[in-house]
């Protein structure tokens, strides 16, 4: 169990790529699945956008810091594209959803960067023993 958690927190490149692909599919299905009618739900879905895009960005940056710019750009384009397409699938395109996604992207980026540094430092310390 602990090694699986470690693998998620400090993913290698291959596992990070798999996670990013899965999260991308989940975000696309969750945000672009056509609804039979528009739903007016109380509350805020901004937290969902924030968390989804933080989770999307984190693994690739935690696996390889050089991929940070690419995954941030990918997340921004994905978020913008979703908000543009949503009105065509009986959803609401909302700039505030995009802003929440952007904040999530940057949180995922900085969290991934910290995890990458910690993992790299841990490997350097164990290799020198």
Model-predicted regions and their roles:
Residues 52-53, 93-115:
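Alpha-helical transmembrane segments that form the membrane-embedded catalytic/substrate-binding core
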Residues 40-46, 79-103:
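Interfacial helix-loop-helix junctions of multi-pass membrane proteins
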Residues 114-129:
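Membrane-proximal cytoplasmic C-terminal regulatory module of class A 7TM GPCRs
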